[in-house]
């Protein structure tokens, strides 16, 4: 099975139950939803493969995309911190506490010249992590965190923002919860993404693109 003419061929030795798509850089570019991806998503759903979304975005940012695509899968937001499977009647679940990353961002604002601890606009809806605006020298943020009382905080650049997350909080942890709710074996799932924050879910599933 091909995702598209320009993408890799998926292994056909298993019957895949689900494809989980990252959003920014995978489903969307800076101009919006990639037109080819709309066709691919709808074709997958017609063929009985559930499409779900896993993103660093907040639920209010992801939900309109999910609805516009008319997909039957769930949402994993905030890099695994939020899980919502409305199609199956499951309530929204917050899997982490974002207060410590937010406090770390405030501290970083006192250490790195020009860094705005308020971060990106969507932080107003963010519950389980904190996001700084994308900066060229994100390693300076990482190095400052590693040598501070906030050394347990992970610093993850995505190309769109720099995420501050607590230990054990990643796309794999959220995806694992969402899959358990549906009784889906992770090894029968394909994950697609393009950034370092996608690596944990790649390691969880049966095939990664």
List each model region and its residues.
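Non-catalytic pre-domain segments flanking phosphatase-related domains
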Residues: 1-21, 184
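Asp-based phosphoryl-transfer active-site loop
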Residues: 12-31, 202
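Conserved acidic, metal-coordinating active-site core of Asp-based
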Residues: 104-205
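Residue-level detector of anion-binding/catalytic polar loops
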Residues: 50, 207-208
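Active-site phosphate-binding/coordination module
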Residues: 30-123
């Amino acid at each position: 099975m091909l995702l598209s003419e320009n993408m890799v061929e998926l292994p056909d030795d298993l019957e895949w139950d689900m494809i989980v798509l990252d959003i920014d850089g995978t489903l969307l570019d800076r101009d919006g939803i990639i037109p080819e991806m709309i066709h691919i998503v709808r074709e997958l759903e017609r063929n009985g493969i559930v499409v779900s979304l896993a993103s660093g975005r907040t639920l209010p940012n992801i939900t309109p995309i999910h609805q516009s695509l008319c997909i039957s899968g769930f949402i994993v937001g905030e890099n695994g911190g939020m899980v919502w499977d409305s199609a199956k009647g499951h309530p929204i679940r917050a899997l982490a506490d974002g207060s410590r990353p937010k406090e770390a961002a405030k501290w970083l604002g006192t250490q790195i010249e020009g860094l705005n601890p308020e971060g990106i606009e969507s932080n107003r809806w963010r519950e389980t992590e904190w996001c700084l605006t994308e900066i060229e020298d994100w390693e300076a943020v990482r190095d400052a965190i590693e040598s501070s009382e906030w050394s347990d905080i992970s610093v993850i650049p995505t190309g769109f923002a720099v995420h501050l997350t607590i230990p054990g909080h990643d796309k794999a942890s959220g995806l694992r919860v969402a899959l358990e709710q549906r009784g889906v074996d992770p090894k029968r799932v394909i994950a697609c993404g393009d950034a370092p924050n996608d690596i944990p879910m790649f390691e969880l599933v049966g095939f990664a693109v």
